[in-house]
């Protein structure tokens, strides 16, 4: 039974990934900021997959001690981590001229440094799993904002570009150690983050919610929102034995937006 640690697991893409792994019989460590949200997700998983092994840990992604404590609790509850899914993130928008140092640091800390901290915590387990011939995996949920630029989210885009750079560099370091490292880059996805972005557009521009949603959908050549389950299936493939030679890649799930 694989032990999969998923951050930002209480909702959206993280919740979809958790359900996909639960259906494959994995043991799950689910981390997030809100215990109530994690508990609700646990109930959903229990209903869908009775008997699934789940450990919940409340974690502040930007606090090194909190991340270490969460990892240690996960390890104690379910054993060494075989797969790490760095999904937790945050997207705040602001024109660059109004992007102060607080916002800049927040975007880098949550989206990039948090990913670094989780990898550092779980890496000994992952290296051990790789040495044993297990399918040890790190998958970082980045964004199309890690592949291209978007106006008004310079700090977020800088952080996600950093995640892509980290993914590629670490993939080379671990290539001969049985651990693959890849990134998945969703376009605008039907999640709370996008719903918050729509609300922000409405507030700042006076557009209706439908107009704001249409503006985001327009980025996708297929003219649709990505669904969390689509992202989850990409993650599942990357974590499968079939993807053993896929390493250091940034896979866009965006209907062709970032070609």
Name each model feature, range by range.
Residues 222-253, 258:
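C-terminal substrate-recognition "lid" of short-chain dehydrogenase/reductases
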Residues 175, 180, 246-248:
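Short, small/polar-rich loop/turn modules that mediate ligand/substrate recognition or access, typified
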Residues 143:
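Residue(s) in the substrate-gating loop at a strand-loop-helix junction
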Residues 10-11:
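Conserved glycine-rich cofactor-binding loop
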Residues 119, 159, 167:
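Active-site helix of classical SDR
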Residues 95-96, 103-108, 216:
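Substrate-binding pocket helix/loop in short-chain dehydrogenase/reductase
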Residues 124, 172-173, 244:
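Alpha-helical segment proximal to the catalytic Tyr-Lys
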């Amino acid at each position: 039974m694989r032990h999969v640690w998923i951050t930002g697991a209480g909702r959206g893409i993280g919740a979809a990934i958790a359900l996909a792994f639960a259906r494959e019989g994995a043991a799950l460590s689910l981390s997030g900021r809100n215990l109530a949200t994690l508990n609700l997700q646990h109930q959903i998983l229990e209903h869908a997959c009775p008997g699934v092994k789940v450990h919940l840990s409340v974690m502040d992604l930007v606090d090194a001690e909190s991340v270490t404590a969460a990892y240690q609790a996960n390890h104690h509850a379910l054993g060494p981590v075989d797969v790490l899914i760095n999904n937790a993130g945050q997207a705040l928008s602001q024109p660059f001229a109004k992007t102060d140092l607080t916002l800049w640091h927040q975007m880098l800390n949550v989206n990039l440094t948090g990913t670094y901290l989780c990898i550092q915590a779980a890496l000994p387990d992952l290296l051990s799993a790789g040495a044993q011939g297990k399918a040890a995996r790190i998958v970082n949920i980045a964004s199309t904002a890690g592949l291209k630029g978007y106006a008004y989210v310079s700090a977020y885009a800088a952080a996600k570009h950093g995640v892509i750079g980290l993914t590629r560099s670490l993939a080379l370091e671990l290539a001969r150690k049985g651990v693959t490292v890849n990134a998945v880059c969703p376009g605008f996805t039907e999640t709370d983050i996008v719903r918050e972005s729509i609300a922000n557009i409405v507030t700042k521009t006076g557009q209706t919610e439908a107009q704001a949603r249409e503006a985001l959908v327009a980025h996708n050549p297929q003219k649709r929102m990505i669904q969390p389950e689509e992202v989850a299936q990409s993650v599942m493939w990357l974590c499968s034995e079939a993807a053993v030679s896929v390493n250091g890649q940034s896979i866009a799930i965006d209907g062709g937006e970032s070609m």
